[in-house]
Amino acid sequence: MEKKETRQSYGEELAILGEKNQNIVVLDADLSSATKTDIFAKKFHDRFFDIGIAEQDMVSTAAGFATCGKIPYVSTFAMFCAGRAYDQIRNSICYPKLNVKICATHAGVTVGEDGATHQMIEDLSLMRTIPNMTVISTCDDIQTKWAVNEISKIEGPVYLRLY
């Protein structure tokens, strides 16, 4: 069996979920080739939104989609999600308990070549303190496939941490 990056499994499973559920929309912050949401984008370009390097806007947009019955999957690096968009996650998604899936890639120190500005180890502690947030951290590609499917069954905010 070939071992894959967790984000590769995330992108593949997200595209499969997109076939099963037309209410799934995917938002990315100009990193779709890195987060692997480009797999979803190629199949469902009308349900994929590249917000650009504007993580706070992306999270707020996801909250808006959720209030209209869509199921947003927000994807970016853990640093930019938990770091830059913390207030929006806390106040716009978690307090009203909106059904938004936040999928943060490049967690920990796995992006060594990008330097300390792209590394995030405190995202787990930040996300775990927010009321109504479910936090899941996967260890490999197999567990990631399972987790992507399981979080789709959770009604409410989820933080999925990928390496």
Residue ranges and their predicted role:
Residues 1-163:
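Thiamine diphosphate
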